[in-house]
Amino acid sequence: MKKIILSLIALSAIAVSSCQPTTAKAEAEKQDVYRISATISNQNITDFQEDAQGYIWIGTTRGLNRFNAHEYRQYYSSNDSLQLPGDRIQDIFMDSRKRLWIATTNGTCRYTDQDNFCQIPINVPYNNRNGHQFIESKDGKIFLNMVVHLCVYNPETDTFNRIFINFDPDKTYKQTCYIDNNNCLWAVNPVSIRCYDSRNMQLTDSIPMPQKITYSYMHNHTSLWLASKNRLFIFDTESKRFKTTPEAISN
């Protein structure tokens, strides 16, 4: 009887000791993907976005941060599919349904009400997962600008599917997209601006730029403001003509 009791004690000790490293490992992994801090995860900031609850989300080159006016909740990537796919944040976007989308250099995801993330597969060649920018059309389509590819979100399969395999015909490797009042998608790169009908993604216009564009902005969904090294252009997306630059700016 004594031998049986000693054997049971020994087995219990082995079971307890074998559980401890697993628990410690799980706790360590949890700390790796979630942290509460008085400071931001990285000083190199890439994007800002306010969500429906009023939290400020801040993307950096190393981690995502949610700020509540007192502290930062930091999020990092891991091998868990319920976490960020990558730590370098490219874009944070809230759509018309108040969903928060995050694009990284290693994939895209959507924030959930469980305080985790749903990673969204991207169906493009060469296993490219570098998301650059989210755009939403007036009829609720979510596009993913990957610079060299353009994808659209399929809610039935919960995937981003490629529309164009070559979305950068000028090979500039720098491109920003906008939706105008007519639900047209405009793609701006350093040497040209292109217009697509977002309903069928047919190219409707392409305008070469007289100077290399370094920055662009869509104003009131009706005009593109395009900055070059020493000049500002204003392009009316309704008439598809360049407008006269205000004298105070042009001078």
Regions found by a protein language model. Give the residues of each.
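Carboxylate-rich, polar loop motifs that coordinate divalent cations or form catalytic acidic clusters
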Residues: 1-251
